[in-house]
Amino acid sequence: MPEGLIVKALSGFYYVQSEGALIQCRGRGVFRKRKQTPLVGDYVEFEAENETDGYVMAIKERKNQLNRPPIANVDQAILVFSAKEPDFHTLLLDRFLVHIEQHDIKPVLIISKTDLLEASERDALTRQVAMYEQIGYPVLYTSTKQADDPSELLPLLANQVSVIAGQSGVGKSSLLNALAPEAKIETNEISRHLGRGRHTTRHTELLPIGEGLVADTPGFSSLEFTDMEAEDLRFCFPEFLSLMDDCKFRGCLHDKEPKCAIKDAVETGEVDSFRYKHYLQFLHEIQDQKRRY
């Protein structure tokens, strides 16, 4: 049975790329019975009715799956955050990073609109972002003048399935247009009254860009931690990993426990205090959710 990759899902149809051809497929009824939904990024077996139409028959095992946006088998996430308009937001960035780390997806940070900053603002931003670089996250800086030049990003996309995410109004669609001008992704100017943009993408699609595939998605519509356990959160902060074995108590949540290596590292500056503050905020949010349900 032929195999292929779902590169687009729209109105109940799944568009499967296979050996240079694009086959418009419907899902088998058995998927509904199993409460299974084929996703963009799925490797599938399909049965062709003719050269252009067919049915998805089976879904290959996924290495990961995001629900909002609905996509599978993602290698890396390009997280776009602006230096200004809207302002750089570390709490929101850390929310994104936790969700990405939870699914074993490699993050790449892009800080856009850096030319809109005054010198003092640029110094403050550089200090904040340096901490993410020290953790090991790759970081690229771009300006509004560089918006049409994706040359620095292209090598990072090779042989990867990438998803672009970030705060509304930071230039995600503009970045995709620079990467794939033929795609003509719809963009919206930021609303100065609201201080944010609007998501413009309506469906999920994988675009061939450079030597890789980049997902044009409707964006992350939910950043809540509904599917995460409190004890799993710590593994989504890479700077904790080498220290956790030094905590006195096995299973330490690095909150109220005594002789905690993470809290000691915050005191010495080895772990950044605002990252730890965000960790505690997320931890208490997860614990409160579990108590409610």
Swiss-Prot record:
Annotated residues for binding of Zn(2+): 247, 252, 254, 260
Xref: Pfam families: RsgA_GTPase, RsgA_N
Residues that bind GTP: 112-115, 166-174
GO cellular component term of the entry, any: cytoplasm
GO molecular function list: GTP binding; GTPase activity; metal ion binding; rRNA binding
Cited SUPFAM superfamilies: Nucleic acid-binding proteins (SSF50249), P-loop containing nucleoside triphosphate hydrolases (SSF52540)
Compartments (UniProt record): Cytoplasm
Organism superkingdom: Bacteria
EC number annotated for this UniProt entry: 3.6.1.-
Cofactor(s), names only, from the UniProt record: Zn(2+)
Residue stretches in coiled coil: none
GO BP term, pick one: ribosomal small subunit biogenesis
Swiss-Prot/TrEMBL keywords: Cytoplasm, GTP-binding, Hydrolase, Metal-binding, Nucleotide-binding, Ribosome biogenesis, RNA-binding, rRNA-binding, Zinc
Co-factor binding comment: Binds 1 zinc ion per subunit.
Domain CP-type G: 63-223
Subunit structure: Monomer. Associates with 30S ribosomal subunit, binds 16S rRNA.
NCBIfam families: ribosome small subunit-dependent GTPase A (TIGR00157)
Family: Belongs to the TRAFAC class YlqF/YawG GTPase family. RsgA subfamily.
Function of the molecule: One of several proteins that assist in the late maturation steps of the functional core of the 30S ribosomal subunit. Helps release RbfA from mature subunits. May play a role in the assembly of ribosomal proteins into the subunit. Circularly permuted GTPase that catalyzes slow GTP hydrolysis, GTPase activity is stimulated by the 30S ribosomal subunit.
Name under which the protein is recorded: Small ribosomal subunit biogenesis GTPase RsgA
Organism this protein belongs to: Shouchella clausii (strain KSM-K16) (Alkalihalobacillus clausii)
